């Protein structure tokens, strides 16, 4: 019985951590060279939108379609008690962002990026490309 309890506890803790600290796979080159296509990054849902600042990287629902996108905050405005963010990709020629659709409501935000985990092969390949 104790083994079953421990297994259930592990599953519950893992599910909680995965919900609060989601692992996100970067798709596309809009955040290159900061984040590479296919790279895994860690987000957090434990943050205050009022504490977000210029330079923070966030994940949000695009205001133009159902895609979830990762971008860097460039400007912040408060209108009628709601925060709006102007978010840009780090690679402008490959980024569909606030330059195309304007400010994004904080209501669209999914999480804040807190860390990245790079595959060692990607790091080595990146260094070779830059040499």
Report the location of each language-model feature:
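Extended hydrophobic leader/signal-anchor segments used for secretion and membrane insertion
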Residues: 1-131
């Amino acid at each position: 019985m104790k083994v079953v309890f421990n297994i259930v506890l592990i599953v519950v803790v893992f599910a909680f951590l995965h919900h609060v600290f989601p692992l996100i796979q970067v798709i596309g080159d809009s955040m290159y060279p900061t984040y590479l296509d296919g790279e895994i990054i860690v987000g957090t849902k434990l943050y205050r939108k009022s504490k977000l600042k210029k330079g923070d990287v966030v994940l949000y629902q695009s205001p133009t379609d159902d895609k979830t996108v990762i971008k860097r905050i460039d400007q912040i405005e408060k209108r009628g008690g709601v925060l709006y963010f102007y978010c840009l990709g780090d690679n402008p020629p490959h980024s569909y962002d606030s330059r195309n659709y304007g400010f994004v409501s904080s209501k669209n935000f999914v999480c804040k990026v807190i860390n990245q985990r790079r595959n060692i092969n990607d790091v080595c390949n990146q260094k070779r490309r830059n040499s």
